[in-house]
Amino acid sequence: MTQSQALTQALILALTAPDYARATQASDLAESIAQGLDFDQVEQCKADALLILEMA
């Protein structure tokens, strides 16, 4: 799994978490993963996560 794929999955987890604590945990993970990517990569991951959720 690439860093971009990991970020996309973490964003999906943050958006679909069943409670605030888990959403915060996933959000923190996503933020940590995003540190190694540039702005355009992070924006693409956000778009990918939203697209995946729309298709679900």
Each PLM stretch: what is its role?
Residues 1-24:
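N-terminal acidic leader/helix
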